[in-house]
């Protein structure tokens, strides 16, 4: 089976060839995927995973690409974007959301059912799959605190469930980062609450986010992990790096923990800014900043 037959092999799945990933990433940067597929359900994911397993074609899975930098050289092989898998089901206090569902939309559905526990995620721009992959969190909350179980597909096509404990959640970490398993859906165990109180908390957190973060510009969200005993944004601010620019990428003047695309920036611009920030903070404070953002793809 030849790779060049991928589109004709799966006529029922939308697949694009040499598709620029800048059209899909929140940074508006990133080179082309050799192939970009848009599965709409688990059966289509299964077909593509089986094909890659059998042929050895490289497979990369992405969601909303909100905390992701794709290098300008693009991505080899097949990229599967799961954002068309958006089903959300509510049963009592349990909410099951497909990998491509918007985390923000899931928090709204929970609110509409008077379910509390997901308020912290009201403004997190990623998909459910991405949130599970990196144990996304904000304002003192973490995804791991409300996950009951996760359905995953291994790279050989096997599907099974992982409990919260088996997911091995940590700070911006989960078991699927190392295993390569693909998140298909996640079930959240929530509690009945007061809808007005839930709404008020979500609105408060969204207002705080809008006041402090550069939501009006393309970015990849929080770039660096929180170093033990420090705040990355404060270190970057204290190093005098706010406003530092390379090409079209800039350390946000609104929040030092963000790098924004101010003028047709490239992934290389982003990576240059990240490297300069890391070097400067290390030099001035002796603190090594680790990236939270996922960086993938070929060198340009």
Swiss-Prot record:
Indicate the segments forming the FAD-binding PCMH-type domain, all copies.
28-193
Family, per the entry? Belongs to the MurB family.
Q: What is the name listed in the Swiss-Prot or TrEMBL entry for this protein? A: UDP-N-acetylenolpyruvoylglucosamine reductase
Give the residues annotated as active site.
172, 222, 292
Disulfide-bonded cysteine pairs: these are none
| Matches recorded under NCBIfam families | murB, PRK13905.1
Localisation per UniProt entry:
Cytoplasm
What GO terms are given for molecular function? FAD binding; UDP-N-acetylmuramate dehydrogenase activity
Known HAMAP family for this protein? Answer: MurB
In its keyword annotation, does this UniProt entry include Isomerase?
no
Q: Which Gene3D superfamilies match?
A: 3.30.465.10, UDP-N-acetylenolpyruvoylglucosamine reductase, C-terminal domain, Uridine Diphospho-n-acetylenolpyruvylglucosamine Reductase, domain 2
- Catalytic EC class: oxidoreductase
Primary role? Cell wall formation.
UniProt-listed InterPro entries: FAD-bd_PCMH, FAD-bd_PCMH-like_sf, FAD-bd_PCMH_sub1, FAD-bd_PCMH_sub2, MurB, MurB_C, MurB_C_sf, Oxid_FAD_bind_N
Q: Its pathway?
A: Cell wall biogenesis; peptidoglycan biosynthesis
Q: Which GO terms describe its biological process?
A: cell division; cell wall organization; peptidoglycan biosynthetic process; regulation of cell shape
Keyword field: Cell cycle, Cell division, Cell shape, Cell wall biogenesis/degradation, Cytoplasm, FAD, Flavoprotein, NADP, Oxidoreductase, Peptidoglycan synthesis
Its needed co-factors are:
FAD
Entry EC number(s): 1.3.1.98
Q: What is the catalytic activity of this protein? A: UDP-N-acetyl-alpha-D-muramate + NADP(+) = UDP-N-acetyl-3-O-(1-carboxyvinyl)-alpha-D-glucosamine + NADPH + H(+)
């Amino acid at each position: 089976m030849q790779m060049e037959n991928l589109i004709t092999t799966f006529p029922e799945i939308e697949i694009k060839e040499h598709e620029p990933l800048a059209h899909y990433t929140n940074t508006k940067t990133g080179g082309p995927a050799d192939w970009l597929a848009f599965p709409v359900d688990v059966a289509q994911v299964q077909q593509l995973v089986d094909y890659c397993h059998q042929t050895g074609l490289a497979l990369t899975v992405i969601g909303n690409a909100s905390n992701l930098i794709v290098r300008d050289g693009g991505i080899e092989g097949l990229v599967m974007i799961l954002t068309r898998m958006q089903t959300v089901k509510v049963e009592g206090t349990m909410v099951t959301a497909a990998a491509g569902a918007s985390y923000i939309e899931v928090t709204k559905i929970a609110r509409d059912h008077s379910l509390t526990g997901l308020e912290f995620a009201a403004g997190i721009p990623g998909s459910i799959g991405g949130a599970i992959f990196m144990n996304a969190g904000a304002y003192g909350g973490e995804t791991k605190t409300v996950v009951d179980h996760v359905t995953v597909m291994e790279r050989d096509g096997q599907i099974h469930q992982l409990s919260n404990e088996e997911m091995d959640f940590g700070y911006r970490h989960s078991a699927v980062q190392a295993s390569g398993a693909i998140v298909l859906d996640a079930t959240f165990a929530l509690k009945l609450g007061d809808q007005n109180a839930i709404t008020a908390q979500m609105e408060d957190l969204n207002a705080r986010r809008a006041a402090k973060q550069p939501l009006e510009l393309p970015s990849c969200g929080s770039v660096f992990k929180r170093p033990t005993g420090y705040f990355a944004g404060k270190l970057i601010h204290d190093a005098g790096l706010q406003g530092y620019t390379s090409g079209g990428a800039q350390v946000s003047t609104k929040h030092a923990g963000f790098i924004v695309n101010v003028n047709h920036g490239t992934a290389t611009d982003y990576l240059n800014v990240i490297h300069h920030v890391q070097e400067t903070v290390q030099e001035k404070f002796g603190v090594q900043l680790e990236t939270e953002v996922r960086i993938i793809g070929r060198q340009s």
